[in-house]
Swiss-Prot record:
This is Large ribosomal subunit protein uL3. GO terms for biological process: translation. Part of the 50S ribosomal subunit. Forms a cluster with proteins L14 and L19. It holds the Pfam family Ribosomal_L3. One of its GO terms (cellular component) is cytosolic large ribosomal subunit. The keyword Metal-binding does not apply. Coiled coil: none annotated. Belongs to the universal ribosomal protein uL3 family. One of the primary rRNA binding proteins, it binds directly near the 3'-end of the 23S rRNA, where it nucleates assembly of the 50S subunit. One of its GO terms (molecular function) is structural constituent of ribosome. It comes from Clostridium botulinum (strain Eklund 17B / Type B). Residues 130-162 are annotated as: Disordered. Keywords: Ribonucleoprotein, Ribosomal protein, RNA-binding, rRNA-binding. The keyword Ribosomal protein applies.
Amino acid sequence: MKKAIMGKKIGMTQIFNEAGKVIPVTVVEAGPCVVVQKKTVEKDGYEAIQVGFGDIREKLVNKPAKGHFEKAGVVLKRTLKEFRLEDVSQYEVGQEIKADVFEIGDKIDVSGVSKGKGFQGVIKRWNQQRGPMTHGSKFKRAPGSMGASSDPSRTFKNKRMPGHMGCVNTTVMNLEVVKVIAEKNLLLIKGGIPGPNKGTVVIRNAVKA
């Protein structure tokens, strides 16, 4: 069965397993999320649920969004996300989805917006090799050749060059849930996940597990 939830990245720490081995984990406050809309094949052509996460002040929400939440009879939420499922009959509008939908040992994919790094050169952005740092070298961290001269007289599209780095949607796949603290809606996930602390992340079943 497909499972999905939104959450807030708290930060990283470490725990010990039964053998005394250190496991680096990311703590995520997963939910509670609320079902705002339920879509069916008969009405919408596909099955999905629309889920809201995170509180927001009323003055920051526009009229169409307010009407959408009022129709569902739920409080205003900061983030809306739609999850496609095979069967939405087990969900109802207004129902809460909490961290206990996942269990210890579940394989998951975590998506989020990566940390922004600003304008970066080709060495940091694309892991290119630098030039010699001594003996009169005139290129140390420079990009090098961007293409031929008279033919084709242009730089090809998708040439790796300096530019804005980070702040893009990123997914880390096949992570493992090592602990679930249901009463606090916390998931402890083995390894690192995208984005800064307090950033919103989406947790789904692993598609390649």
